[in-house]
Each structure stands twice: as C-alpha cells, then as structure tokens.
Swiss-Prot record:
Cellular component terms per the entry's GO annotation: extracellular region
Family: Belongs to the DEFL family.
GO biological process, any: killing of cells of another organism
Disulfide cysteine pairs (residue numbers): C38-C63, C50-C76, C54-C78
UniProt protein name: Defensin-like protein 208
Subcellular location: Secreted
Keyword Nucleus attached: no
Keywords: Antimicrobial, Disulfide bond, Fungicide, Plant defense, Secreted, Signal
Coiled-coil zones: none
Length: 82
C-alpha cells in the first residue's frame, strides 16, 4: 500500500512540475486587477461596448471589460494585467 501511495504521489508531483514549467497552469487569473470604471453611469451598452471603452481609456493593459450591477445600477468595470 505504501509503495502504491509513493508512486502516485511521485507521479502527481511530476505532472504538476510539468504543467508549471510549460505554462499549462496559466489562466486568465492575471485579469483580475481592477483598473477603473469607464463610460457613463448607468452604462447603456454591452460587455463588448464596455471592453472597447476600456481599451480606449486604459490601452493594451485591458484584458476584460464587464458590465456589472452595483446597487441596481449598471457600471462598466475594466480589468487588466498591470
């Protein structure tokens, strides 16, 4: 039993190291930094309109623009990597 557990643990460790070294684990998690708001409040457009507004204001650092409701009012929130 212990030998099987050691083999499984070693295999899992190798898989995690392989995934980390090849960048497989990289996701859009880097896209969680709030850059600011964009456009009018309440924001009248869609997520695509929001992303366009964000790119216009914040440049290439933007990886997502989302219309989110705060207190019943729609806002355009910009998220990026820097």
């Amino acid at each position: 039993m212990a030998k099987n557990l050691n083999t499984v643990s070693f295999t899992v460790l190798l898989l995690v190291l392989l995934m980390a070294s090849t960048g497989i684990l990289e996701t859009e998690a880097a896209c969680f930094k709030f850059l600011g708001e964009c456009g009018a409040v309440p924001f009248p457009g869609t997520n695509a309109d929001c992303t366009s507004c964000c790119v216009g204001n914040f440049g290439s650092a933007v990886c997502a623009g989302r219309v989110e409701v705060e207190g019943g009012v729609k806002h355009c929130h910009c998220y990026g990597t820097s």
